[in-house]
Design a protein with these regions (language model features):
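Hydrophobic alpha-helical transmembrane segments
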Residues: 2-146, 151-212
Length: 212
């Protein structure tokens, strides 16, 4: 009888474990994407202190890379290692967490290669489009898109809307915003993993500058 009782409880316990794992995944995604969203302040800072901001981003990229190599060798770096552990996904376990590197590199390259308005569009697309798409997919994504490694309709539509709005508020041109948002949504669908942090600001910055 006791054995039967345990068997009856097992599905509930399993559901509880799955729920906790999902909540943990959502919490990590919220933390990760809050960093993405904070990058929306970069275009404003670039207007007033361009060189110091670019220097700070480059220094952050280098210091983070050093900290990650040390972490992989078993040496913990105060604050940096804690932030990495809080943001790391399952696929990042025991690996160099590349996301912050590509995030900084994408922003730096966009700022260096494009006019300020185009760089801003690319950076905002990264901050809001990519940032909110993943959250929407985790929270509301029930319909999966085939051949996209788990991307969802909710995430893609959120990406499109966020890029369209942020682009329009920079250029006040609906056609450009529509084109940029469409390209951004397509990039978001590709299985680029952390490399989307590079492709989104660079490709969308180029599209915006070409069309404006």
């Amino acid at each position: 009888m006791a054995r039967k009782g345990l068997n009856k409880k097992y599905p509930c316990e399993k559901d509880g474990i799955v729920s906790r794992q999902r909540l943990n995944d959502i919490a990590k995604e919220l933390f990760r994407k809050s960093i993405h969203v904070c990058s929306a302040f970069i275009p404003l800072f670039l207007q007033f202190m361009r060189l110091p901001v670019l220097f700070a981003l480059t220094a952050a990229l280098v210091l983070y890379s050093i900290a990650e190599f040390m972490r992989l060798k078993g040496k913990s770096i105060p604050l940096v290692s804690a932030v990495t552990a809080a943001a790391a996904r399952k696929r990042d376990e025991n690996r160099f967490v590349l996301g912050p590197v590509t995030l900084c590199a994408g922003i730096i390259l966009a700022a260096l290669l494009f006019e300020p308005f185009a760089a801003s569009i690319g950076i905002y697309a990264l901050a809001f489009g990519d940032g909110l798409a993943s959250l929407a997919g985790k929270l509301f994504g029930k319909i999966k898109i085939p051949l996209t490694q788990g991307k969802t309709v909710a995430g893609s539509l959120t990406c499109f809307a966020a890029i369209f709005v942020s682009c329009f508020l920079v250029c006040y041109n609906a056609k450009i915003a529509l084109c940029v948002a469409s390209v951004g949504m397509f990039i978001e669908l590709l299985p680029l993993k952390d490399l989307d942090n590079l492709f989104i600001p660079l490709v969308l910055g180029l599209v915006a500058q070409s069309l404006y």
